[in-house]
């Protein structure tokens, strides 16, 4: 897989991540800044590092499964490896301007 193909897959991944929501927050996980890394590998697997807005997120399992299902539905993705990371700790500065406006922080 060449670099251009990887970039196209990464763009499609971002598009599907924008359809994943924490059930308690009306902003998608991409704009919340919960995705730290997306790496598309030559074999079509994707390594994704993500976090939660709270360490004890009650919807964690639901969100991770939604992310995995949607990533694996992207054309060109063979499998998704989702790594939960908590450093750096998520804070409001990681949100997009759009998310800050939606949530009344801007």
Question: What residue ranges belong to the model's regions?
Answer:
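Domain-level signature for proteins that mediate thiol-based redox and metal-cofactor handling
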Residues: 1-106
